[in-house]
């Protein structure tokens, strides 16, 4: 009788456990207990909620995925979840801090269809003290070894009508350069593409930013409001609109990240995106040297008070190499001159290389080996601007030649996409560049996603409306700048074309291609080198604008990487105090 009772009790607990997972909820809390995640089945469909300090931010948000063999998200059961604690310490060569301690709680929630085709997908959730992240895992399984995804229906049912700060985009092919809009969520237009990160300010001074981490072999995600609901939208494969992702199993999505805090400065200092990425793939990183660089395109390749004409020639580059050397800077960039690249582009301009463009065919007026040898003799390294298309066409030959010349890195430009193919291409650039000891600076590119941990040769990305616009419009001013730390910078480094030393107030400001003006003050410009995360700081004005001028000594001394970043004082779009720290 006693033995039978034990069996009955065990059977009862097993039944209760199955019922708990199949019909009730799975819950996860951050290590400090402030952030809570829950997943339940609503009519056999998974929905999730997120709360911070008992304040609900996201409520009953559906998770559905649409594939070529049907939608996944209805007639689903929850199998037994697996809970664990994740803790690690690691170092970043380029990042917001050098020494990182990451602590999170994780649950793997197996979701399985109860009707044919009986597919299985895992929802992996991690809770940090500064946010929640989740991703979809697609394990290889009988009868399902590959997929074509039409839509990822991740949704975010916001509560409390938060204020939203976002960048609206006209379409998926974009340089991600524009003015940010601040509005209440209820008043925000439907069916407009929203870039990420987007910031949501809730009542009681609670802040949440939505972005993504570890975007690899997948399409980039955007936000989209429709019928009041906030949805994720994937960038479609080029030339059509339906297919978003194609993959063989096993496969996984990027992390969908909700950065959360009651101190907005904590979002700026957060390392959650690098925490969610794989460790460094580069065995020897001793050659990776962040630093500061010229960028003569911005100033118009100006060479005042010289006996030679500025252009695609040795004297012009020597002029700037000598400037870098005598001021203890690091890099000189070569892009070309006017609208002509340093290589044969066979096209109408930088953004439109022709079919016969050849990255290995240097224009006759330049001897790249001579320039690199001279730079080396002065303790200066060279990095090259390139359009991504001719570079990718000869990626292996080009990188080998660059290494032979002694090139340190590249600015890769005009990608303007983040569909799955372009995401793959960007990672291929990083991986192959590392084999040839080359750093990468992406321009005309999508937001970062913490991949600088895996590939620390990624120094910075553009993807912001920045000071290059001072050459043709009046959009980049201090009011625009102060939005950056609370929006795009939450995702990581940005190249902002810093360094303009010729300032004019807005009422006197004028656009000009050569020796352009900026609308910010000198002090504002200097502060941007500390506030804006970038591991390749531009010194983009002319030697004449800098040498002997107040503030240039600071530019020469300011680091491009820090050992610690804290934000003790910040008010959205008004001000912030960011005392970074460098060991020693």
Question: Where are the model-predicted features located?
Answer:
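An acidic-aromatic substrate-binding cleft motif
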Residues: 251-320, 327
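Glycine-rich, acidic and aromatic/proline-enriched surface loops and short helix-turn segments
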Residues: 296-300, 322-331, 338-339, 371, ...
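Aromatic- and carboxylate-enriched substrate-binding clefts and catalytic-loop regions
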Residues: 336-517, 521
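Bacterial Sec-dependent N-terminal signal peptides
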Residues: 1-24
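Conserved small/polar residues in nucleotide/adenosyl-binding loops
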Residues: 574-580
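N-terminal accessory beta-strand-rich subdomains and adjacent acidic, glycine-rich linkers
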Residues: 25-281
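Glycine-rich, aromatic-lined ligand/substrate-binding cores of catalytic
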Residues: 509-572
């Amino acid at each position: 009788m006693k033995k039978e009772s034990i069996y009955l009790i065990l059977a009862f607990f097993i039944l209760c456990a199955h019922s708990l997972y199949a019909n009730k909820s799975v819950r996860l809390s951050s290590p400090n207990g402030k952030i809570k995640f829950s997943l339940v089945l609503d009519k056999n469909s998974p929905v999730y909620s997120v709360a911070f300090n008992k304040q609900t931010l996201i409520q009953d948000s559906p998770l559905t995925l649409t594939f070529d063999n049907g939608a996944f998200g209805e007639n689903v059961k929850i199998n037994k979840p697996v809970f664990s604690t994740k803790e690690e310490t690691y170092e970043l060569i380029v990042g917001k801090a050098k020494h990182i301690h990451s602590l999170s709680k994780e649950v793997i929630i197996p979701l399985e269809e109860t009707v044919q085709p009986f597919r299985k997908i895992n929802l992996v959730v991690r809770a940090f003290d500064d946010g929640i992240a989740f991703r979809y895992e697609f394990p290889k399984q009988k009868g399902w070894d590959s997929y074509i995804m039409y839509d990822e229906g991740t949704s975010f049912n916001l509560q409390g009508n938060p204020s939203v700060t976002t960048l609206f985009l006209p379409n998926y092919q974009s340089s991600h350069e524009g003015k940010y809009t601040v509005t209440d969520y209820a008043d925000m237009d439907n069916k407009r593409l929203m870039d990420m990160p987007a910031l949501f300010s809730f009542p009681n001074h609670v802040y949440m930013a939505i972005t993504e981490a570890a975007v690899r072999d997948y399409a980039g995600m955007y936000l989209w409001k429709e019928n009041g609901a906030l949805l994720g939208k994937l960038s479609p494969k080029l030339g059509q609109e339906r297919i978003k992702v194609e993959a063989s199993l096993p496969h996984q999505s990027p992390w969908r990240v909700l950065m959360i805090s009651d101190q907005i400065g904590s979002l700026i200092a957060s390392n959650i995106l690098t925490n969610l990425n794989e460790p460094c793939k580069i065995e020897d990183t001793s050659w990776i040297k962040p630093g500061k660089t010229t960028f003569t395109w911005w100033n118009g390749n100006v060479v005042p008070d010289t006996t030679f004409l500025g252009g695609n020639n040795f004297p012009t580059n020597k002029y700037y190499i000598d400037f870098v050397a005598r001021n203890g800077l690091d890099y000189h960039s070569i892009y070309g001159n006017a609208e002509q690249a340093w290589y044969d582009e066979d096209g109408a301009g930088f953004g439109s290389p022709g079919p016969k463009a050849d990255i290995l065919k240097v224009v006759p007026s330049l001897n790249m080996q001579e320039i690199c040898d001279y730079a080396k003799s002065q303790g200066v390294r060279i990095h090259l601007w390139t359009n991504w298309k001719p570079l990718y066409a000869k990626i292996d030959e080009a990188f080998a030649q660059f290494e032979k010349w002694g090139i340190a890195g590249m600015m890769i430009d005009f990608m303007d996409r983040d569909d799955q193919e372009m995401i793959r291409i960007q990672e291929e650039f990083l991986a192959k560049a590392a084999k040839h000891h080359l750093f990468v600076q992406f321009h005309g590119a999508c937001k970062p996603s913490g991949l600088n941990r895996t590939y620390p040769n990624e120094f910075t990305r553009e993807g912001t409306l920045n000071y290059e616009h001072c050459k043709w419009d009046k959009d980049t001013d201090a009011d625009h700048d102060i939005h950056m730390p609370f929006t795009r910078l939450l995702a990581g480094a940005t190249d902002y074309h810093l360094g303009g030393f010729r300032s004019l107030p807005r009422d006197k400001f004028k656009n000009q291609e050569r020796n352009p003006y900026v609308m910010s003050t000198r002090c504002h410009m200097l502060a941007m080198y500390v506030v804006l995360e970038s591991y390749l700081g531009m010194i983009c004005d002319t030697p004449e604008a800098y040498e002997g001028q107040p503030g240039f000594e600071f530019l020469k001394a300011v680091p491009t990487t820090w050992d610690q970043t804290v934000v003790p004082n910040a008010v959205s779009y008004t001000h912030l105090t960011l005392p970074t720290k460098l060991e020693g």
